[in-house]
């Protein structure tokens, strides 16, 4: 048995989980609704305030799907109940972020500002011009949007300039030591 897959997913109050016969899982909660199609090789059942994920056989691919399916359902339940937040920090002279409506405008030292439209299901929040929070109920989407923002200026190892995640540690390098 998968260590992750054998654990049931607890359903908190205010959250409803429904599973169709073709393994489409719908999770509704106070923050919204998520729908995801899961593999037909896995059995998903809702039993008294928990979701139980089981498998029919022990083939390698089915064992891998077992833990994955349970983790995806857990992420959906957490998302509609609490939501997800990824915080990015802009480090560098003149690196700024601001909101224009639902659009995020980044000044990153290019000759032009970088504009990013908010994808449906994701919203931006800017704190002090150098912190950007990406919020949403879909963990995968929040992480993808945060990675898209970070990719514009990845942190460089010499001065640490760039866009980094809040708790990310940048491995620093020593510069050249000049002739003596």
From Swiss-Prot:
Gene3D superfamilies (alphabetical): Ribosomal protein L6, alpha-beta domain
UniProt entry tagged with the keyword Metal-binding: no
InterPro entries named in the record: Ribosomal_uL6-like, Ribosomal_uL6-like_a/b-dom_sf, Ribosomal_uL6_a/b-dom, Ribosomal_uL6_bac-type, Ribosomal_uL6_CS
Protein origin, superkingdom: Bacteria
GO cellular component: cytosolic large ribosomal subunit
Keywords from the UniProt entry: Ribonucleoprotein, Ribosomal protein, RNA-binding, rRNA-binding
GO molecular-function terms, A-Z: rRNA binding; structural constituent of ribosome
GO biological process, one term: cytoplasmic translation
Pfam families in UniProt: Ribosomal_L6 (PF00347)
Keyword Ribosomal protein: yes
NCBIfam families with a match to the protein in the record: L6_bact
Family of the protein in this entry: Belongs to the universal ribosomal protein uL6 family.
Reported function: This protein binds to the 23S rRNA, and is important in its secondary structure. It is located near the subunit interface in the base of the L7/L12 stalk, and near the tRNA binding site of the peptidyltransferase center.
Self-association and partners: Part of the 50S ribosomal subunit.
HAMAP family: Ribosomal_uL6_B
Annotated protein name in UniProt: Large ribosomal subunit protein uL6
Native organism: Clostridium botulinum (strain 657 / Type Ba4)
Taxon lineage: Bacteria, Bacillati, Bacillota, Clostridia, Eubacteriales
Gene that specifies this protein: rplF
